[in-house]
Amino acid sequence: MTAIFKREFKSYFSTPIGYITLAVIFFFLGYCFSIIYGYGSPDVSTVVMAMSSIVIFIIPVLTMRLMSEDRRQKVDQVLLTAPIKISDVVFGKFFAALAVYALGFVPTVIFQIIVAFYVKVNILAYLYALLGAMLLGGVLISIGMFISSLTESSVIAGVLTLVINILTLYMSSFSQMIKVPEGSTGFIAVIWGWIVKTFVAFLDKTAFMTVFEKFGDNVFRITDVVYFFSIIVAFVFLSIRSLEKRRWA
């Protein structure tokens, strides 16, 4: 897994992708920090939480080539026939993308140190927000990686990941567009109304953005961590199964 991780991590910086991604993140974080600090707020966790605004665009760039590029260049045949576990390949690629994503948050540590010189900071609020950002990134990377394993076109993988990111992050907003029947009469109408209400409530509670925003409340909830971690495990597993299917095809 270590060899795959190093190979993938270096590949991000052998092309402009890694540099452009970090430049965009650094610029956005710096801009947010200047605004928040300008208003006299010492809360760096707010800067971290603001990352959700661009994460839907950053992740597709990081994941669109993870699997599809190897498949297009036929490099995957070497990996699939080599004496190496498929799980090591997948985990190596996943952690490489996550490492590049995590590098983007290094400036927030500097921001936290700067603010600490002037005012008392809430380090726990910052750590909670950072944990949420890492978990959200891990979730979206795992989804993007799985999509990338299904096609040899980086463009298709990137576009699909972007669309799914928008849908999963903002399901709660979409749920508000669903008209919930009220004042229904009759058994079928009542049952249908209950189904719609339950579905809307489900979308609202499971939307990634809804869960992520809870990390900004300065309250640690193990259920939110487990929820995000479970999704990561699920899509990493699906990526492994996708590659294993091609190995034995």
Predicted regions located by residue number:
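A hydrophobic, multi-pass inner-membrane permease signature
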Residues: 59, 74-75, 93, 106, ...
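Terminal transmembrane helical anchor/hairpin motif
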Residues: 45, 158, 164-242
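Secretory targeting signals
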Residues: 32-37, 41-54, 96-161, 169, ...
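Hydrophobic alpha-helical transmembrane segments
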Residues: 1-69, 110, 218-249
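Membrane-interfacial segments
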Residues: 37, 68-71, 75, 115-119, ...
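Helix-capping/transition residues at the boundaries of transmembrane alpha-helices
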Residues: 11, 79-81, 144, 148-149
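Helix-loop-helix units of permease transmembrane domains in multi-pass membrane transporters
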Residues: 66-96
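Alpha-helical transmembrane segments of integral membrane proteins, especially early/N-terminal helices
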Residues: 10-26, 89-97, 188-194
